[in-house]
From Swiss-Prot:
One of its GO terms (molecular function) is oxidoreductase activity, acting on paired donors, with incorporation or reduction of molecular oxygen. Belongs to the TrhO family. This is tRNA uridine(34) hydroxylase. Its EC number is 1.14.-.-.
Amino acid sequence: MPVLHNRISNDELKAKMLAESEPRTTISFYKYFTIASPQQTRDALYQVFTALDVFGRVYLAHEGINAQISVPQSKVETFRQQLYTFDPALDGVRLNIALEDDGKSFWVLRMKVRDRIVADGIDDPSFDASNVGDYLKAADVNAMLDDPDAVFIDMRNHYEYEVGHFENALEIPADTFREQLPKAVEMLREHADKKIVMYCTGGIRCEKASAWMKHNGFNKVWHIEGGIIEYARRAREQGLPVRFIGKNFVFDERMGERISDEVIAHCHQCGVSCDSHTNCKNDGCHLLFIQCPQCASKFNGCCSEQCCEELALPEEEQRRRRAGRENGNKIFNKSRGRLNSKLSIPDPAE
């Protein structure tokens, strides 16, 4: 029986990827469709992807698939063909190609079965996720941005919105997508007669959010086809003004794609203009924050003097301290509250 998971250390895999001579293409795709046996599908797809030297992160659930991957350039077309023929539901699925790509976005293939491909917290049995809003293409997006009757809603996390968003888009202040959904309904009640335009990175969150808004009585709902990635690509190809301002945060080693020249965020430590995210180098912290080159040098890549001091401790002492911390206070906690607390940043909601 073939091995259906990775057995090599992350350090070895990363070194191997960095030593590759062939360029890679970073691709993301998703599809909401019924998967009867997610584990069986996962195992079969793992073998297909492994044979093509695909790296990345793939989630499968009964409701569909969500993938962010990198593929050797010489195998992209073979990958496309094998994906499209793997299941009829995947035939022709849109592949979002990264806008900025050094080919170093992933170095290992991880495939996981989950309850949902996007954690939404929805437990209403009458909710129909297929009853989505209408798609908007790039030219339509620009027209909507000039329509005083339209309201743009950003369905991404606070750290994504901070470095880039559409002109005058509303941020839904919440730490997770599941928290955003009910809050979006609440916030938009006063705009019930407006045209609601929802967007996210690649389309997967805003597509479900558009269905949720319709489920809650909103009738004029749109979402951007392919999200920010597809919008920017098509706008550039068609010679249209790109109306997204700043950087598009992405969930891989790049942590962002430059969409426009504007830098709308600031270093969380000194306040200079900066939109480069990083994780605190202290393994007991890993706070996601924005850091300029000068502060990166001053704090040795850490978010605070405390973490800088801890990073300088012997490895054994660092491990001892990490063992005594709650998991929720580590890298997986990207909440605005933790960021504000660690770096003494005023809460914009207050």
